[in-house]
């Protein structure tokens, strides 16, 4: 799984949006720091950046009538199986949240979606 370019979040079909929530939850929990070719870049940033991205996903889910567990809205929460962070510095959201989400990454994401039969 990959983290879709954040500009695509409002356009993602249901399955991809909900998949992003699962991916973010896994990465914020026990998956933090575990190598995975398509998401390794998130580990070079503060976990707070991933929280900010996940917050965008949850906001879009709520716009569509889904109700993600409110526990995930806590930036220190890491899931039921992992102890929460004690603290980490809050950061101002940048656009894009992850600098890696540039125009080339957007094109890569669009091609990936196209290969799945999803035209945005």
Go through each PLM region and give its residues.
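Expand to "…catalyze enediolate/carbanion chemistry for C-C bond making/breaking, isomerization
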Residues: 1-120
């Amino acid at each position: 799984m990959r983290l879709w370019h954040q500009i695509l979040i409002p356009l993602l079909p249901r399955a991809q949006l909900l998949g992003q929530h699962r991916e973010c939850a896994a990465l914020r929990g026990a998956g933090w720091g575990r190598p995975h070719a398509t998401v390794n870049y998130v580990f070079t940033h503060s976990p707070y950046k991933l929280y900010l991205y996940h917050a965008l996903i949850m906001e879009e889910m709520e716009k569509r009538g889904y109700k993600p567990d409110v526990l995930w809205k806590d930036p220190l929460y890491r899931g039921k199986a992992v102890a929460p962070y004690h603290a980490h510095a809050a950061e101002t959201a940048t656009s894009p949240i992850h600098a890696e989400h540039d125009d080339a990454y957007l094109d890569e994401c669009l091609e990936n979606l196209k290969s799945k039969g999803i035209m945005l």
